[in-house]
């Protein structure tokens, strides 16, 4: 069985977010608490789960599977000098960067944004949100 390195698509996503030149911190490590976060704006990439799905292609060495990675982006913002809906502009900018074709996408053959949710403003002017993504890669042959 041959398989794809799961780190590769996560690193590609991290590179896309860094190339935006918007976030002061792009991390695949431990998610900081919004209240104690010292570097804003920041974004954290977390792999929630992965699924291998038969894509119907049969080869001489077995069936081919696509891998779908379910990823959460946690976004921390400071809206001190921004309007109340600034976080929606950030959300749209992140979504556009992810969906735009780029040479930085190497192993990811498709991607989509499933949705987002945001806090209710209890820590204003700081704002926290999450975006859920699906990254599709050519997975493995079994």
PLM-predicted stretches and their roles:
Residues 1-35, 49-142:
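Charged, amphipathic alpha-helical segments and their flanking helix caps
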